[in-house]
Each structure stands twice: as C-alpha cells, then as structure tokens.
Amino acid sequence: MLLDKLAFIENKYDELSVKISDPSIMQNQNEWRKLCKEQADLEIIVNAYKEYKQVIEDLQVNKEMLSDESDREMKEMLNEEIASLSQREVELEKEIQILLLPKDPNDDKNVFVEIRGGAGGEEAALFAYNLFRMYTRYAERQRWSTEIMSLNETDIGGFKEVVFMIKGNGAYSKLKYESGVHRVQRVPDTESSGRIHTSTVTVAVLPEVDDVEIEIADKDVRIDVFRASGHGGQCVNTTDSAVRITHLPSGLVVSCQDEKSQLKNKEKAMKVLRSRLFEKAEQERADGIAADRKSQVGTGDRSERIRTYNYPQGRITDHRIGLTLYKLDSFLDGDVQEMINALITADQAEKMQKMGNSEM
C-alpha cells in the first residue's frame, strides 16, 4: 500500500512538471505559482522515494553477488554494504512515513504571537517580557524578522500584553506548539524573605491569514481612534493615531498604537483581527472532535498548562511530553530548538499511530 501511494505521488509530480512547462499555463501567473508550490511540496517525498528504490535495487544486486561470491574478503565487504543498505532502508521507510503525514496547511505561514500576563500580577508581567525576549531571540537564530503590533508595558519593564509578528519560512510549523499557559517558579526581586512565587503567562500563536481566507465586512467592524499612551498611561502622541477595532459579530477587540500613522495602526490591527477570527473558527472546528481523538501535544488550547520554568533548579519541564531540560538561562535566550524538535517528533509519532490504527 505504501509503495502504491508513493508511485501515485511520483506520477503526480511528473504530471505537474509537464504542466509547469506548458506556455499556456505560464501565462496565468496565479495558476502557475499554485502548481509550482504543489510540485515543491511533493519534491521531497519523490526524492526520498527515488533514493528508497535505489537502495532496494542495490540491496538486491549485493545479495545476488554475495550468493555467487567465494572470496572471503569480498564476502565481508558485501556483507558490510548489505548491512549499511539495510539500515538506510529502515531509515528511509520512517522518513517517508513522516513525509506522508497530513500536512498542516498553515505550517509555512508567518505568525502572530500574543503574550499576556496571567496570575501573579507584576511578576507575571515581568515573565511575559522574558518570554517575549525568548521568542525574539529564537527568531534571530532562525534569521526571521519580528515586528511589534501592540504593546502594553508596566512601570517596571514588564508586559501586561504584547502582540508581535514573526516573519519567516516555516514559522508556524515550529512555534504552533507554544500556545498555552506557561508557569514560572522563582523568587521575585522584591521578595525579601526569599520565598518562591508561582506566576503564569498565556501564549497564543496564530498563523497569518490573508484577505481571501477571512473576509471582514465593513458593517461588521467599529473603528475607534485615540491618542497613544506609554508607561502608566502617559500620553506620548498629540494626534489620534492609535486604533481600536471591534468585530461586532464576535465581540473580538484589537488595539494597535505602535505606529505614528493611524493608517498603519489600522492595517496592523486588521491583520491581527483576521488571524484571531481564523483561530476562533479553527478552535470551534477542533472542539467538535471527540475527546479521545484530541492531540496530546496540542497546538491551541490557551487554558492548557504546557510548561514550567523553575528558576531555583534551572529547569524547564514540558508537561505534554514529560521532557525536562536543565539549561534555563540559554533556553530563555532563545535556545529552544531542542524542545521544539521533541514536540514535533511527539506530534508526528502520535499522528503515525492514529494513521496506523485507522488503516487496521
């Protein structure tokens, strides 16, 4: 069954190659780009399949040579080659199974990250800043760009709320597992007795969506303008450049005051609103799935406590996969790839198990 599926994909890839070279299709740039993307998505699977077929062929040849060989040294060499090819065969089978998993259509998209201080007051706001810095430092390591959409600071440098955009190839595929409640355990600077406090911060990761995916009618929004404010509500602008958009059907409210231009703030706010509406629709769809089919790793439930950052022990524990890392300082400086890789692997394993169960 697996080989039949791979042969079908290879044929599809070849058909797309022919279509992409067709001058009549090339004249329609939108259609041509769509076909190019479809082919690019299949290319990695086709390349793995071609290598797999070559490995199988080489194995067959080496086994036939071994059966006819009488020289001891040649036999040893052939046995080593067969062992190496057999190992590569197993590796490729696993790689191909992962490549054949249903792809999240949002994986290649840019993201909006929303971080809000939860339980813990000022300490939660300070940790919200720590998480903001962690994600922006990770983005730098990935050579992604970041842009603040809206920010509400506290007097001592914490963030009550920050919404920012991360632009980069595959940003959503790596950051989507960060949605949920992040818990911090540490001694606040203001705590004279040395008692450990527990605070929480909520993170939401939303894929960027375009106008076609989510249409917002003018009659469904109310737009208010006001003067931008800084620390403690101090006015930092003499014009009404800040924008607040209320989506009347859903009640969602988005504010943006980071830009000096009212028009730019409106554009940013609309982008965030569009992504929030998309997430709301996706969440409503996910809520309809039976509880026993919901993902262990999870990518969307903001009320789910997903991770604990324990400062005294220098550890980070992800509760979904039971992974603990003892490198808190470097983790908060953006060294989070090990955790992300583990979450991706766990998600893939779970999906493969579900696929196996459905095929039985």
From Swiss-Prot:
Q: Which domain of life is it from?
A: Bacteria
User: May I have one GO cellular component term?
Assistant: cytoplasm
- Keywords, ordered alphabetically: Cytoplasm, Methylation, Protein biosynthesis
Residues annotated as carrying N5-methylglutamine in the record are Q234
Q: How is it modified after translation?
A: Methylated by PrmC. Methylation increases the termination efficiency of RF1.
Name the InterPro entries on file.
Answer: PCRF, Pep_chain_release_fac_I, Pep_chain_release_fac_I_sf, Prokaryotic/Mito_RF, RF-1
Q: Name one GO molecular function term.
A: translation release factor activity, codon specific
Identify the SMART domains for this entry: PCRF
What is the annotated localization of this protein? Cytoplasm
Asked if the Swiss-Prot or TrEMBL record annotates the protein with the keyword Transferase, the reply is no
State the Pfam families in the record.
Answer: PCRF, RF-1
Stored PROSITE patterns: RF_PROK_I
Is Protein biosynthesis one of the keywords UniProt gives this record? yes
Q: Which family does it belong to?
A: Belongs to the prokaryotic/mitochondrial release factor family.
State the function annotated in the UniProt record: Peptide chain release factor 1 directs the termination of translation in response to the peptide chain termination codons UAG and UAA.
Q: Report the protein name in the record.
A: Peptide chain release factor 1
Species of origin reads Clostridium botulinum (strain Eklund 17B / Type B)
